[in-house]
């Protein structure tokens, strides 16, 4: 074999080894990605300095056995380890970004509605983002989560002035979503109109049906006013702001009115001074709470035409030493005398036993969720 042929043979052998090294490095990178997935799943940190130091030590010992320079092995594998860490960090960052993007909150109306304020408050506390879609009814808000367009839906369920929001309660009976939390918002309604609009000149008011109910005493002072329902308070404010008409006004929140260059004609007009609305957060997955002190379950109970249904519920809970936090109901049919009960109870770890007792007298039971 000539010298030239010998060199060519050796170089070809090295080329094959280099290709094998590339393939091995690619396989190592894939394993690093698998490790990143496992770390995210189990909430482990990306970097394990102790393991890296131990690995370098073992590799240099192994290298010395093969007559490889210690600094050469340390330098080579330090680069490989650093690349592995960067690969994992990049993957985890992308994973978290995608997860964050998916965790959107749907709510009624647009920017400036009370539902938007509630969603904003919840998003800030739990590091979520708000959807940019505008939903004009409660049903569409729920559907957005059922169809995985959003991760969470936020809906008003009760107001101190107007009471239960029946439309939402009816939707809760049908949806497969679960309640995972709640939040409270002060609904300080204002009468908003174009600047320099005298209150006596106003003829028509725009708002969602709930503010009309919550400000009924104030509205009754002006019997000639015509009331026009909108899908949300933000829509009402936008409409009044858009129209060049000083005979119309909107009920809504002051800050959003100011953003739309409307003037506060009257404030603190709710029937109750401390007008609070409770919102619930719905999701496809249940939450599991291990802290007994904060463990609540909401249950929907549909009466079996039984006038003593409320008494039965209270007796069963009392017998099992379960604290009743809240009991609300509404009549679905005056003819059938059917009532739907919603209860919140504390520390319910014997749920199956309780459900068996309820089913003796109750037509339908549905657990809405824990929070």
From Swiss-Prot:
Record has Glycosyltransferase as a keyword: no
Database matches in InterPro entries: Chor_mutase/pphenate_deHydtase, Chorismate_II_sf, CM_dom_sf, CM_II_prokaryot, CM_P_1, Preph_deHydtase
One MF annotation (Gene Ontology) recorded for this entry: prephenate dehydratase activity
Chorismate mutase domain location: 1-92
Site (Essential for prephenate dehydratase activity): 277
One Pfam assignment: CM_2
Protein name (record): Bifunctional chorismate mutase/prephenate dehydratase
Species whose genome carries this gene: Buchnera aphidicola subsp. Baizongia pistaciae (strain Bp)
